[in-house]
Swiss-Prot record:
EC number annotated for this UniProt entry: 7.1.1.-
Principal location: membrane
Binding site for [4Fe-4S] cluster 2: 73, 102, 105, 108
Organism, scientific name: Burkholderia multivorans (strain ATCC 17616 / 249)
Name of this chain's protein: NADH-quinone oxidoreductase subunit I
Family stated for the protein in its record: Belongs to the complex I 23 kDa subunit family.
Cofactor(s) of this protein: [4Fe-4S] cluster
Annotated binding of [4Fe-4S] cluster 1, by residue: 63, 66, 69, 112
Cofactor note: Binds 2 [4Fe-4S] clusters per subunit.
Pfam family, one: Fer4_7
Domain 4Fe-4S ferredoxin-type residue range list: 54-83, 93-122
Length: 162
């Protein structure tokens, strides 16, 4: 670039005007910003959100303490303790998920042989302290009880792909 060309580019501010023209072109286009939480975007049917533990229709919890979900979790976010009952079946005494470690990969849900642990469509949850994101067995069962109809519908819709 010659000195004269450089002088004209800097004197007439052509680079600045090109930038302003580009900005002007995008000023009046449709905006893609979503004003969350007032506006919501559609959620995929396979979205993986908050975990829940399910129960059978008779009220008994589904988890058989096989510990497959604990073994397959890449983030080591699941902790399970179990005991043998009088009828020689295992049941969990402790089932904890640390959501600060969880990467929501869905391996726990895929590995469960009795569909006990599921990931729901719930994405609006928070914790003000680190301990608020540590879900115990009772908390997970409460989520499962509250949203059982939604969970069952999502499982039925996803059945052809399993």
């Amino acid at each position: 670039m010659t000195a004269i060309q450089h002088f004209f580019k800097t004197f007439f501010l052509t680079e600045l005007l090109k930038g302003l023209a580009l900005t002007g072109r995008y000023t009046f286009r449709r905006k893609f910003t979503v004003q969350f939480p007032e506006e919501k975007t559609p959620i995929s049917p396979r979205f993986r959100g908050l975990h829940a533990l399910r129960r059978y229709e008779n009220g008994e919890e589904r988890c058989i303490a096989c510990k497959l979900c604990e073994a397959v979790c890449p983030a080591l976010a699941i902790t399970i303790e179990s005991e043998t009952r009088a009828d020689n079946t295992r049941r969990t005494t402790r089932y904890d998920i640390d959501l600060t470690k969880c990467i929501f990969c869905g391996f726990c849900e895929e590995s469960c042989p009795v569909d006990s642990i599921v990931e729901t469509q719930i994405l609006e949850y928070h914790g003000e302290k680190r301990g608020d994101l540590y879900f115990t067995k009772e908390m997970l069962l409460a989520v499962g009880d509250r949203y059982e109809k939604d969970i069952a519908a999502a499982k039925a819709a996803d059945a052809p792909y399993r």
